[in-house]
Design a protein with these regions (language model features):
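Positively charged n-region of N-terminal signal peptides that target proteins for export
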Residues: 1-4, 19-20
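Sec-dependent N-terminal signal peptides
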Residues: 4-15
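Residues on the lipid-exposed face of transmembrane beta-strands in outer-membrane beta-barrel proteins
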Residues: 40-46, 58-60, 77-85, 98, ...
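Repeated loop/turn-to-beta-strand initiation elements of outer-membrane beta-barrel proteins
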Residues: 51-56, 89-94, 123-128, 155-158
Length: 158
């Protein structure tokens, strides 16, 4: 795990130097971002600067459960929100993302928190990180790795 975090840290420092462009900017304005993020999510948000975007949206979490030799797949609807920060306004940029959400787990509401580091090329964001699920009384239900791929559809000139 330490090696993965080291690679992500090096990538975040190196990516802004890979490409410089005066013709591309992330700009400011509204966007939607369909995304695979431990499930399927639709983010609706606002790019408040070329470096920061806020988003909220519905999603469908995917759970893969293993008990002995039995594997089951479950889905759960979820509402979430978060912030994504870019390291530059170039076509290539490093990206850090934090999202938190609520979903129904059996009879009670549970929370999901995720922290992702990665890269962005123009409107395509991709990365990996960690997620953790909490139940009632802050009981840890599960945790693990997370991979994300999303595409920003922007409703403003950039």
């Amino acid at each position: 795990m330490k090696k993965v975090l080291l690679v992500l840290a090096i990538a975040l420092m190196a990516i802004p130097a890979l490409a410089q462009s005066d013709s591309y900017t992330r700009g400011r304005g509204f966007f939607i971002r369909p995304e695979l993020y431990g499930g399927l999510f639709m983010n609706v948000g606002y790019q408040i600067s070329p470096y920061v975007q806020l988003s909220v949206g519905p999603g469908c979490l995917l759970f893969i459960n293993q008990s002995g030799s039995h594997i089951s797949v479950d889905f759960s609807a979820m509402a979430h929100g978060g912030v994504r920060v870019y390291t530059s306004d170039n076509p290539w940029a490093g990206m850090i993302d934090y999202h938190a959400g609520v979903f129904k787990n059996g009879k009670y509401l549970a929370q999901r928190h995720s922290l992702v580091g990665g890269a962005s090329y123009k409107d395509l964001d991709f990365g990996g990180g960690l997620q953790i699920y909490f139940g009632p009384n802050a009981e840890v239900l599960a945790y693990g790795a997370l991979v994300t791929v999303g595409y920003n559809i922007r409703f403003y000139k950039h």
